[in-house]
Amino acid sequence: MVKTVMIVGGQRKSLPFFWLAEFPGTERGKMYCQINAGGLYGLQSYVAQVEVDISKGLPCFDMVGLLDSEVREARERLRVSLHHINAALPAEKITVNYSPAGIVKSGTSFDLPTALVILAAQGKVPPERLRELWAVGEVGLDARIKQVRGVLAMLHAANQSAFRSYLIPFENLGEGLAVGKLPVMGVCSLEEAMEYVNASAQEQERMRRDAEDRWQSQAKGRMEKEKKTPDFALLCGMEEAKRAAMIAAAGAHNLLLAGPPGTGKTMLARCLPGILPPMSEEEKQEVSAIYSAAGQLEDGTLIQERPFVSPHHTVSVYAMTGGGAVPKPGMVTLAHRGVLFLDEMALSLIHISEPTRLLSI
């Protein structure tokens, strides 16, 4: 113990001050745990690790590892959600590390693995099971697991590591089932995720089958939706233009449509995806992974038709080509394996037309 001098109201007072190291039990604790997660940087996915250490000391919650604001905000989301399931954060020093530290971590997909690794450090779930588990998902204030973008691309990267089990939001289960015969479990809440981790191998398999059956029953009506692409055979007239379109589609050539307004140029362009060859399973995976990374994958199911992208002629270079500090796909990328239609091209600025002048349909 040492003494410090404080001046209060003009009077000198000697106050005792205790060094933290003098308190018993302040030595470093052994509550350490690790889990596997997935991250997305542009269209590139990678496998990440989330580590937590809970030790004695002043209560704090530190998150390190080159994190974006979306990841740092998980601190408050998890504080409330863990309290909702009667697993409040301990009044100790909590340090969470996200590796690899050289890659910017963005998005909300790290919420679920962070919550699970904290629960394991508190003894709520077996820590040894998390080392063979891969998890992504956003955690709400009410402990519900919400949909995240890029699950399809992240699962492709995680599949190379051959983890024992994969934990994703239930709303993303369609993307997980499309990757292949992976042991993917879709969960709706943090309690369900804890139940799955604590269950035996046979019980986990039963829970995965039940989740798949629930998703299939909900997605049955959504998968039987009408085609979006207009039928090329319903176009009347314009025989020369239709022949030019068929030649361009057969050879994947560029096509320039010129003519007065109202002659059917836009309708002809919208029908082009319908006469292109059907996408293979590999192409469906590619296109769906791009739209999943962009957060535009509808209903969590694979895209079956070739995309048709028609940006406005006033679109910016950033929106057209993509990019940014945290790269995001642009219109050109969204038209992968499909048709990019530049309407009113004469009104577009030259810096918009130049990046796309060598693109084929």
Which role does the model predict for each range below?
Residues 257-296:
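Walker A/P-loop
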Residues 311-334:
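Short glycine-rich substrate-engagement loop in P-loop NTPases that contacts/grips substrate
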Residues 296-299, 303-314:
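Conserved P-loop NTPase mechanochemical-coupling segment
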Residues 259, 322, 344:
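The Walker A (P-loop) glycine that initiates the GxxxxGKT/S ATP-binding motif of P-loop NTPases
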Residues 329-353:
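Conserved AAA+/SF3 P-loop NTPase catalytic/coupling segment centered on the Walker-B
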Residues 3-7, 18, 22, 26-256, ...:
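Peripheral, non-AAA+ core regions of ATP-driven protein-machinery
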